Amino acid sequence: MFGMDEAKFERIDHREDVKKLIAKIDTTMGEIELELFHDKAPNAVWNFVNLAEGRQENVKNGPFYDGIIFHRVINGFMIQAGCPHGMGTGGPGYEFDNENDPELSHDTEGVLAMANRGPDTNGSQFYITLAPTPHLDGGYTVFGKVVNGMDVVKSMGTVDVDPYNHKPDTDIMINKVTIIRE
């Protein structure tokens, strides 16, 4: 019988041997290009890749992120997406453990990390920082960084939002996530 860690680990269905992974997120506000740290946070990266490509078992059919909105935007802090309900309350139907590599931190803008509701509750939600946020180190898995399109991320960070839940007044949609292997 599998312990909790093995059961969670098994949920990441597909992995590959690659030198470099790039994710291009095409949004209604422009494109964001991210380098994924598959060697430092393999569970988070392959979960993201498999969801993006529709290979990971989840609550949606097909590519998970296509058509999902950035449901939370806090100017000067971060933008967040990955909830299939568009409210920050949902995920793919499973969770996996945090990966905290001491070499990865929230030390700059453009950090890509898993959003969660507590330790070891990662699923599909992710955020991109708009500024250094070192207070998040150790609690959230950093798994990539913006390499192109930080201007798009910053523009997203300035949209009008509901003051209560920080949901943008006008939806910012993910049209498609494309994964490039090198």
Predicted regions and their residues:
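Cyclophilin-like peptidyl-prolyl cis-trans isomerases
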Residues: 1-182
